[in-house]
Amino acid sequence: MRECHKDILQRRIIKLVNDLEPEPLLLYFYSKNVIDEDDMDEIQSYNLRRTMSKELILKLMKKGPQAFSNLVDGLQNKQPFLACSLLQEG
């Protein structure tokens, strides 16, 4: 992920952790090869939605250059207000 995108996620992490619904996004990210099965299992092992959200964002920040655009695309389908929030930061 590019540094400018990491910066956006870092600035918006509190909103993302509070509002993100990670479960519906996991299969989407898996289908796009953004995360692998081990990542999915690890994220799903957490009991709290907020912890799952935090771990997902932290993992995405370490992924390839398409991770940010895949996050925005996934959010546009599931939680468009979060996608708008990220795009406005950029």
Where are these regions (language model features)?
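Alpha-helical death-domain superfamily interaction modules
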Residues: M1-K15, E21-G90
